[in-house]
UniProtKB/Swiss-Prot annotation:
It comes from Corynebacterium glutamicum (strain R). HAMAP family: GMP_synthase. InterPro entries: Class_I_gatase-like, GATASE, GMP_synth_C, GMP_synth_GATase, GMP_synthase, GMPS_ATP_PPase_dom, NAD/GMP_synthase, Rossmann-like_a/b/a_fold. Residues 9-198 form the Glutamine amidotransferase type-1 domain. GO terms for cellular component: cytosol. Its EC number is 6.3.5.2. Disulfide bonds: none annotated. Homodimer. SUPFAM superfamilies: Adenine nucleotide alpha hydrolases-like, Class I glutamine amidotransferase-like, GMP synthetase C-terminal dimerisation domain. Residues 199-397 form the GMPS ATP-PPase domain. This is GMP synthase [glutamine-hydrolyzing].
Amino acid sequence: MSLQTNHRPVLVVDFGAQYAQLIARRVREAGIYSEVIPHTATADDVRAKNAAALVLSGGPSSVYAEGAPSLDAEILDLGLPVFGICYGFQAMTHALGGTVANTGKREYGRTDINVAGGVLHEGLEACHKVWMSHGDAVSEAPEGFVVTASSEGAPVAAFENKERKMAGVQYHPEVLHSPHGQAVLTRFLTEIAGLEQNWTAANIAEELIEKVREQIGEDGRAICGLSGGVDSAVAGALVQRAIGDRLTCVFVDHGLLRAGEREQVEKDFVAATGAKLVTVDERQAFLSKLAGVTEPEAKRKAIGAEFIRSFERAVAGVLEEAPEGSTVDFLVQGTLYPDVVESGGGSGTANIKSHHNVGGLPDDVEFKLVEPLRDLFKDEVRAVGRELGLPEEIVGRQPFPGPGLGIRIIGEVTEERLETLRHADLIARTELTAAGLDGVIWQCPVVLLADVRSVGVQGDGRTYGHPIVLRPVSSEDAMTADWTRLPYEVLEKISTRITNEVPDVNRVVLDVTSKPPGTIEWE
C-alpha cells in the first residue's frame, strides 16, 4: 500500500525527456507537489489525479515525425493551467492551432533570448542566457497567446495567455544552465496558475506520520530494516513517530560497513528517535561467503543472498519475541519516488522494485509494505529527516552501496583488506568534511586496488604497497555524474595522511572519469 499525499499534484507529462524527473523536482523546490505521468495518459487519467496544473516536458522528437509522442487533445480542454517546455511547448502549440516549423536554425546549448514583457520574464534582463535543445521551432503562437521572447533560431521562444492560465518556453528552465529558469517556472506556478506554495518539510512530515498511523492502525506492529543510510533511517523515524514502540528496527552488521557506521545507528539513530533496535552481528557469515570470490557480479550476488538469509533470521527472532497473541504484519521500506517512476509505478502500473537493504523474505512470512517516502525525492527525504530531528551525520550522509566496502575492494574481500580500506576511507571523509566539501560532492568512493602492487619509497627502502583510488563525483541524481574538482591542497592532505597512516598503502590516485562512460562505483 502506498501513502498517497493529500496535495493536488502538478502533473509533469513525460514525452520521453531525460529531464522529466528533474522538472518534477524543480516544481517541488518551488513549494508545490508534483508527479510524473506518461504522455499516453488520457483526460480521464488527469481528472482522476485531481491535478492542479500540467507541465509538458521536453522530448527527443519532432512533432511532425512519424510516431511522435502526442497529448490527448481533451486534456487541454480541462481548464487546467498548462506550461510547455521545449517539445512540450511545440506539442502544446500544435494542439492549440499555432504553427511549428523547421526553420533550419537548430539551437543546442547556451543561447541568448530577447524578452518582450509578460509575466514569466518580468524584471529579468532584456537579453539573457538560456539552455536550448531543439531543431523545430514555433513560428506562430496559437490565437490569444502573447509572444514574450524570441531567439535567433526560435521566433517564438516563449508565449503566455493569462486568461487561460497557459504559457510555455522553447528552452529548458529546469536545468542549471538556464540561470533564471527556476524563477520562470515558479512564476508560472504562482502568478499564472495561481497555486499555493504549501509543500514544505514540516507539512510533509506531519502528513506522512498521520498516513502511516492510518495504515498500520492502533494495534499494528512493523519491522524496519536499517541499512545505515538516509532512506531507511528517515523511513524508520517517520514510522516510529507514528506508532512508537510497536516498530522494531533491525540492523544487520555484515562487516562491510565504513568506520563508525554501526555505532552511528546504535547510538545516534536510537538517541534521536527512541526506536527499538535489534542489531544482528553477521560479520563472519559474510566473510566466509566472500572467501575466494573476486568477480564483481559474483560478489554482489553472494552479499545479496547472505543478506536475505541474515534478515530472515533477524525477522524470525523479532516474530518470536512479539507479545503473545500479536503479529507483526507490516514491513517498512525506504522506496523513493525515482524508484517508483523508473519501475513504471508513476503511471499507476507495474510493481515497485524491492530495496537492496531488504531483499527477499521467506515464503511463509507475508508483510504488507509501508513505504512512507515513495512520493519523495532524495533532497526531500533529507529535509524531512532534519524536521524529525535526525542528526546531520545521518541525514547528510553520502550515498553508500548496499554491498558496502565489498565492492570497493578490487579483488578478494578479507578482514585485513577491509581494515585497510576502512582506515583510508575514514581519512578521506574526515578531510573532506574538515574542508567543508560535504555539500559540494555527491559522494566520494574510496577504492582499494587489492590485486595491484605498486612500487614506492618509504623511509630509506623500497615498498610494494597497494594503490588507493579517490572517486569524488558531483551529481543531482546519480544517473549522470562529473568528477569533482577538489582543491589540490585537500587532495594533498588526504594523500599524505593515507600513505603515512595506512599500512601497506604507498600510492593515492584520483579518478577523473565522468558518468558516462564510467559508473560511480568501480564494481
